[in-house]
């Protein structure tokens, strides 16, 4: 869990991270200006963990790992979620910048992450 490997094919180089929580085999993929978050992170929050095979603690550890990874990616890159949900203002964005995700995503800024880090 929470291990990133580099995958290359032709001119495409991607980082693939095992990000369990929502599902045991969930992965996120980043490269070429995008972070494909799948069901780990949405534009404003994170994926569900009340499904068969979900693991809430693994999800929080995956979000913590993702946050550390996102802090080191270019801030203008796009975070693309696996699902689109309405925001409180009624918009339904397809993506957010990594900068905006780090500032406004509830899960990326949750006090739970501070507890996991031991702060």
Q: Which residues are covered by each model-predicted region?
A:
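Short acidic-hydrophobic, aromatic-tinged amphipathic segments that line or gate anion-handling sites
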Residues: 1-4
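Metallo-beta-lactamase
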Residues: 13, 18, 23-113
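Conserved acidic catalytic loop of the alpha/beta-hydrolase fold
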Residues: 7-9
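C-terminal regulatory/interaction regions
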Residues: 117-119
